[in-house]
């Protein structure tokens, strides 16, 4: 049995949840999201609490219902608080700027990298060396942050590149004479 799946998902005030068959729809102050649960998992809404349980005692159902509960919890958190990832840019001349709906990154290449901001994602640049990616879908926020980081991942010698704000870069010692 999944320890994550056993816990119920509480619906916060100001959020409405609706379960229709295998689809869970959540509407909150930041937007609307929906998630379709696998057929091996049953979903039940009672008293502003969503409970998830496996329909069968198979290994697949056991493994899927904890995941389904986590996804539903992310739906509720996304429409209430939203998700945010912060990126830092380190390096001489490395910087970021927003130009319309594009993020322009100067990362030491011969040309600037232009990243189009996807729908449902908000990117802000408080400083030229900081990028904040926000949205209501945790998977998309993480994916966009990973794509931006992928243009110039931090290198282990000087630490130059794009890294997550809480990421630690293991430094290597340079060549010895």
UniProtKB/Swiss-Prot annotation:
Keywords: Ribonucleoprotein, Ribosomal protein, RNA-binding, rRNA-binding
SUPFAM superfamilies reported for this sequence: Ribosomal protein L6 (SSF56053)
Highest taxon of the lineage: Bacteria
GO CC terms in record: cytosolic large ribosomal subunit
GO-annotated biological processes: cytoplasmic translation
Gene Ontology MF, one: structural constituent of ribosome
Alphabetical list of NCBIfam families matching this protein: L6_bact (TIGR03654)
Subunit note: Part of the 50S ribosomal subunit.
Function: This protein binds to the 23S rRNA, and is important in its secondary structure. It is located near the subunit interface in the base of the L7/L12 stalk, and near the tRNA binding site of the peptidyltransferase center.
Family: Belongs to the universal ribosomal protein uL6 family.
Name this protein carries in UniProt: Large ribosomal subunit protein uL6
Originating organism: Afipia carboxidovorans (strain ATCC 49405 / DSM 1227 / KCTC 32145 / OM5) (Oligotropha carboxidovorans)
UniProt gene name: rplF
């Amino acid at each position: 049995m999944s320890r994550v799946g056993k816990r119920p998902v509480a619906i916060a005030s100001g959020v409405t949840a609706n379960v229709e068959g295998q689809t869970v729809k959540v509407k909150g102050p930041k937007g609307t999201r929906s998630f379709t649960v696998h057929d091996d998992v049953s979903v039940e809404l009672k008293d502003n609490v969503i409970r998830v349980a496996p329909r069968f005692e198979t290994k697949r159902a056991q493994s899927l219902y904890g995941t389904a509960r986590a996804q539903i919890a992310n739906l509720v958190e996304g429409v209430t608080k939203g998700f945010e990832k912060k990126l830092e840019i380190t390096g001489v001349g490395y910087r970021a700027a927003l130009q319309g709906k594009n993020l322009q990154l100067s990362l030491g290449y011969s040309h600037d990298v232009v990243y189009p901001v996807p729908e449902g994602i908000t990117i802000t640049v408080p400083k030229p060396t900081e990028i904040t990616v926000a949205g209501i879908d945790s998977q998309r926020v993480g994916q966009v942050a990973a794509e931006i980081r992928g243009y110039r991942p931090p290198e282990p010698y000087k630490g130059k590149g794009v890294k997550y704000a809480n990421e630690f870069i293991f430094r290597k010692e340079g060549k010895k004479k």
